[in-house]
């Protein structure tokens, strides 16, 4: 690749919109799998090692995280004993299979150091060269730059840093990626047209739109919000095929303020309790949650949005209720199909250690399988049910709270207080699940006999 001056390069990128980076990444949908090295130190089913990664389900596996040395500005190992003495990095690249093995540099605590390193030409050179040396020595195929919290004042220096990587990557097959935030206030801190021309893909952190830091409950990663973020970057110059959408393999949890107030937007008193492995208030890995649901099915009420792109559970125990926003194989499969149909580049998963990699709840890696199986063959979304065939009724006990609907058997049931609202109850992965539907017109009522929406005057009490 012919080198151009930085100024001319940026001009040509903006004017022609051409790709500066060689196209070394696959054009097929990507599944970018983040692996946190520190999960080696967990116990029991929470522990994970590189050998536990099913690389056939990942196009890229990302070893997280590396830092930057404050004195030398070289790439920094954050756990030398694990990474070198225990040969963890070598195990990671040895077991990569056909996936691209990458390193992630940065994270939430590295913004200030990135700012200092990227501001000086000599520091940029040192950091990039040391990164390439490490990747070459241990068999990595590329790097993800995760400059979390970058400020507008650093925008030009970020592009200069990517330009330095581009210079040193010339005539190599190294993969270059960056991570972008989902916060609206941060969008314009990034020179998206310039960045797009330097990278093979952009990992957009479409996570945590709601969480226990806010004292109201809500879907942590609802698809409409995720799509708004992707569209915002697309309007700023990011090609759709270069963006991968981050999805959580974890749940966000709250303690409800009132046990009978369980809808999206209702108040919470704080975060849910720590999980057995993750040990973080308001946070559960999927493998922690699925074990809990299977062990106490009767204490959980699971509600799925009518479009199948969001799901939550309410867990009633010890005189309080937890509200849990999570993903399952159905929501993730729908998201995978939806975004690839729109031309986006795939998904990144946060993180492999949160997946059921050991198969403690059933088959191994159910979430990864759902994502990959839906990239290439579409699943027809079921329309809102107006007429349905008779169903087989099965009865299960669910902890009841006065004034709150719970599924006790499969079927369709009208809400007791709002006749245009009705519930579909059917078997899911974790027992009975309910999906909330509404009649097209608020003056209608749902008729449980005909299973259609009719004029409310035809239904006694409506």
From Swiss-Prot:
One of its GO terms (molecular function) is chitinase activity. Glycans are attached at residues 338, 441. Residues 404-462 form the Chitin-binding type-2 domain. Expressed in the peritrophic matrix of the midgut, and only very weakly in fecal pellets. The keyword Metal-binding does not apply. Its main location: secreted. Coiled coil: none annotated. It is found in: Secreted. Transmembrane segments: none annotated. GO terms for biological process: carbohydrate metabolic process; chitin catabolic process. GO terms for cellular component: extracellular region. Keywords: Allergen, Chitin-binding, Disulfide bond, Glycoprotein, Secreted, Signal. Residues 29-378 form the GH18 domain. SUPFAM superfamilies: (Trans)glycosidases, Chitinase insertion domain, Invertebrate chitin-binding proteins. Disulfide bonds join 33-58, 439-453. Belongs to the glycosyl hydrolase 18 family. Chitinase class II subfamily. Probably a non-catalytic chitinase-like protein, which binds to insoluble chitin and enhances the activity of the catalytic chitinases. Has weak chitin-binding activity. This is Chitinase-like mite allergen Der p 18.0101. It comes from Dermatophagoides pteronyssinus.
